[in-house]
Amino acid sequence: MAAPRPPPGRLSGVMMPAPIQDLEALRALTALFKEQRNRDTAPRTIFQRVLDILKKSSHAVELACRDPSQVEHLASSLQLITECFRCLRNACIECSVNQNSIRNLGTIGVAVDLILLFRELRVEQDSLLTAFRCGLQFLGNIASRNEDSQSVVWMHAFPELFLSCLNHPDRKIVAYSSMILFTSLNSERMKELEENLNIAIDVVEAHQKQPESEWPFLIITDHFLKSPELVKAMYAKMSNQERVTLLDLMIAKIVGDEPLTKDDAPVFLSHAELIASTFVDQCKIVLKLTSEQHTDDEEALATIRLLDVLCEKTANTDLLGYLQVFPGLLERVIDLLRLIHVAGNDSTNIFSACASIKADGDVSSVAEGFKSHLIRLIGNLCYKNKDNQDKVNELDGIPLILDSCGLDDSNPFLTQWVVYAIRNLTEDNSQNQDLIAKMEEQGLADASLLKKMGFEVEKRGDKLILKSTSDTPQL
């Protein structure tokens, strides 16, 4: 006569399979832990049993890493590992008691070691990929809103796990490892990233490849951009494509729906120093684009994005004052505008005033946008700043700006920023107003163009007066 089966264990009134010895028992636990009441009443002994199964099954993975011929025998072990991770993952959802119990058993270290073994196997098996993903989900859940677990995850996972997973070909593995990194990061751990820049750059690359994934985006905007030291170190080591991605996210943060906070302002001032100094040093690289061989030069395109960032930063009142007095910035912008203007006049190239507007009205050439933004930046830097207004005059920038619009007045984007710049240059500045009035009289400024821009010249006795018309500028 067969021995009677032991009665099933109970989880505070919920029937539980016991002992947990096989796949069906683990699957039953996984299903039970989908409900909060079962998670809240789970005994610690359950998690010890799951850990024992996980450790036993991991031995097969270790063997396969040493002997590749053993990979084909992994199927049953991978099934058990996957279900262990699913069970633990579900148990941790909104349950700090379970998070603490599982952590205190040493499960996090076992899980991280196993995940690193998965990466070593380098074989394409759906079952391996599923176990890999579930392991990362477990680490994300045990660390969620639990600082003690975050510390243990960081201790075991940094930097090897992130170096192994953030550049993985599987999109879900990249997303889940990004979730773990986002959850675990704090100000102290950010300093460790400065010594492991490859991880930070891998996050930027992950966002570049998966812009729809929220975790890499949040890591960059909520953590990286709050650390000027990290951004500076990253920028120096990045490829130009990665720089463009980072600068795009910086723009998104500045122009986003939520205004910069008081804490953000000093940080973005530090970014402004990096962006402005880099632009001043490297902006002439853009002239490479005048050559047909360099029309897609990544370094030049990254420099164009620096200008886009400067335009948005100078549109922010908290950042404008710093950049208005930044050494050499205004002079370099005017100098570059002149060089581009001459290049566009001398030959047919990417800076020439031809065929730059698409049928839908968008500027089709990044170079045309660059010229517009140079003029926009001059206008921003001269906003209510007499010193900069006078400096533009001294550098013969006013005729240059007017001539830029005259050559290609079919471009509404360029015309818009010329109007804006001229208004800022002439506001409360009689010297600049007189200059434009005299240019009109001498035929150096087109009266019809000035009228389109909302200005007209009036003669009062021996004086020429530049005044605004009541008409809206015709853009």
Curated annotation (Swiss-Prot):
Q: How is it modified after translation?
A: Polyubiquitinated. Phosphorylation at Ser-12 by AURKB promotes the association of ATXN10 with PLK1. Phosphorylation at Ser-77 and Thr-82 by PLK1 may play a role in the regulation of cytokinesis and may stimulate the proteasome-mediated degradation of ATXN10.
**What S-S linkages are listed for this chain?**
none
One Pfam family, please name it: Atx10homo_assoc
Task: PTM Phosphoserine: list the residues.
Answer: S12, S77, S430
Record-listed Omega-N-methylarginine modification sites: R10
> Which family is annotated?
Belongs to the ataxin-10 family.
Q: What does this protein do?
A: May play a role in the regulation of cytokinesis. May play a role in signaling by stimulating protein glycosylation. Induces neuritogenesis by activating the Ras-MAP kinase pathway and is necessary for the survival of cerebellar neurons. Does not appear to play a major role in ciliogenesis.
Q: Name it.
A: Ataxin-10
The organism encoding this protein is Bos taurus
